Regions:
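Short loop/turn segments at secondary-structure transitions that flank enzyme active sites
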Residues: 64-67, 105, 126, 130, ...
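Short, Φ-rich (hydrophobic/aromatic) sequence segments
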Residues: 28-37, 112-124, 128, 208, ...
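Assembly/oligomerization interface modules of large self-assembling protein complexes
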Residues: 6-95, 154
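Hydrophobic side chains in beta-strands
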Residues: 60-61, 101, 177, 251
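Alpha-helical scaffold segments that mediate packing/assembly in large oligomeric complexes
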Residues: 78-168, 266-279
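Short conserved micro-motifs at the rims of enzyme active sites and ligand-binding pockets
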Residues: 69-71, 111, 186-189, 214, ...
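Extended oligomerization regions of viral-like shell subunits
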Residues: 137-255, 272-279
Length: 279
């Protein structure tokens, strides 16, 4: 890459501040990562990527009705033997983030590019985290995701979810937690070093509620469908994006999610009425 998205957009903005538009033939959240100086695992980083141009058809396994489990030999020992295989499909959807350009910023090409690269693209990465977790097409929206209630200690709940994954012959490859639980329940305990030694990745994001965690075999169970195209442009944002109306700059990528194995993801949830409260 010879120039950053911010540098490319500055050229277009200088020529036409009201209608600037730059298209990219790659996904800018993948190709340019402003967090590289401050390493932090995004949800995208947990997933293998599959290029996609349109609707993608893929194989998927689901848990069967309880009435069918008894007919499978050694169903308790090898739970995955009971899973039912079929086909599913997923499309690409836009993921967008917005900023407004401060007056006078365009006079400084370096500062302008930095603002796009380190503010707009960071917000786009946040929007991507949201889309892949609790968005309409995210993992948490899948009807076959298993909810795993826990009582008491957060770390004990996380380890229980890891155990559930390995009891179906998979690996606790990664988890998504809220920063609150990372700092208050995980940092300062041996659990982070032990999970790292096991090869378990941890993404921390506000898109998972405090006290909750999404634990799964991300490497095997899902694929990020990457449209391989992006755009940064000047546009009127939807109502409610900012406190006042007026044009802004939007960054957009096109992505989807193929959840091959919803059986391999566990959403750990606290039993609130048993006494769990944020510190």
């Amino acid at each position: 890459m010879t120039e950053s998205p911010g540098q490319a957009f500055h050229k277009a903005y200088t020529d036409d501040p009201a209608g600037a538009r730059v298209s990219f033939d790659y996904t800018i959240t993948e190709a340019f990562m402003p967090t590289k100086e401050r390493p932090r695992v995004t949800v995208r980083n947990l997933l293998k990527v599959r290029p996609a141009a349109d609707t993608t058809h893929f194989w998927q396994e689901r848990r069967p009705p309880r009435s069918e489990v008894a007919g499978v030999s050694e169903a308790q020992l090898r739970q995955e033997a009971t899973f039912v295989s079929g086909m599913a499909s997923a499309g690409l959807h836009p993921v967008r983030a917005w900023v407004r350009i401060p007056d006078g910023l365009a006079d400084d090409p370096e500062a302008f590019a930095e603002f796009i690269d380190y503010r707009l693209l960071v917000r786009l990465a946040t929007a991507e985290n949201q889309a892949l977790t609790l968005g309409e097409h995210g993992i948490l929206s899948h009807p076959d995701l298993t909810r795993l209630p826990y009582r008491g200690d957060f770390v004990a709940g996380v380890l229980a979810a890891c155990n559930e994954i390995e009891q179906i012959g998979a690996t606790a490859h990664a988890m998504i937690v809220n920063p609150y639980d990372w700092w208050y329940s995980m940092v300062g305990r041996s659990v982070l070093a032990e999970l790292a030694a096991n090869g378990t990745l941890i993404s921390r994001t506000r898109m998972i509620a405090p006290g909750h965690a999404l634990v799964g075999d991300f490497a095997v169970g899902a694929r990020l469908l990457d449209g391989g195209r992006s755009e940064i442009r000047v546009e009127e944002p939807p109502p409610g994006t900012f406190a006042t109306p007026g044009p802004a700059v939007v960054a957009e990528v096109w992505e989807g999610l193929a959840l091959h194995l919803p059986t391999h993801f566990f959403y750990m949830t606290p039993v609130v009425d048993e006494g769990w409260t944020p510190r």
